[in-house]
């Protein structure tokens, strides 16, 4: 059954996106649907990272009095996207939550992936939220150059038509996972974790397209569904702006993009040449921080007023900076 949220007017609708990174590695994105009074009526989180006792994702959810996450996506089991996911499940997921996981990530020894310490605990937490009537665990894949509608809901103003909101998965690709499973069975070759990455597109009213690209790389990008990228409003640049993910530039608009990246310091990411290419076509380009460890985190906040002023306000915290 389609979920519906009543709002007084489209002009009161706000979309807040928080892109969170840390001084050495780590990525999490919190997306809040709210009214003009900052009342949150839908929450989406992609990935998590924590550094010691610091979990900025949890802090943000607490700040906005979020009682439960509607949709949690664990894009792939790399450490810099995974630490603290189990904390979010334990504190914010209930019998209404959906948890997206790449198809084939089931915590078994035969999954053709080398799990990090703690990954299987995350998977156990996810399965623990399954019940007879509500399957929280949603394994995600789609065919090459295809897309999968993950969820949808409508905003219902008093005096206007409903606004349709859709969330699509554009990866990982089922063909590659099947091939990787065969190679593991026959040759004991592990799959590269980034090739499991879930890439999401949030479509608001078929007018605004927000892309959460996790760590997809060129092998996936070369076979990804292109249409939504051609109309992109916002893109979290894949794989910390590496050259190995730069083919996405061929699919994106030539100007007026809003783009951002997290970092992975030990790998020398973001790549300066890749950032220069994004800079040319972006009205806004931000990073969660490439400077020295003045602060141990960086947060980029985008406050979208899509139907009132048709504007975006940007606020930077910690190490976050303009490129």
Language-model features: where?
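Binuclear metal-ion centers of metallo-dependent hydrolases, dominated by the metallo-beta-lactamase
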Residues: 2-9, 95-164, 223-224, 255-323
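Active-site environment of divalent metal-dependent phosphoester hydrolases
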Residues: 25, 51-52, 77-83, 106-109, ...
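Core dinuclear metal-dependent hydrolase active-site scaffold
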Residues: 1-68, 138-234, 304-323
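Active-site metal-binding motif and surrounding structural segment of the metallo-beta-lactamase
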Residues: 37-44, 51-102, 226-242, 253-257
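Adenylate-forming
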Residues: 249-251
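Short, solvent-exposed loop/turn and secondary-structure capping segments
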Residues: 84-85, 111-113, 180
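Hydrophobic/aromatic beta-strand patches that form the interior of the parallel beta-sheet core
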Residues: 18, 73, 100, 168-170, ...
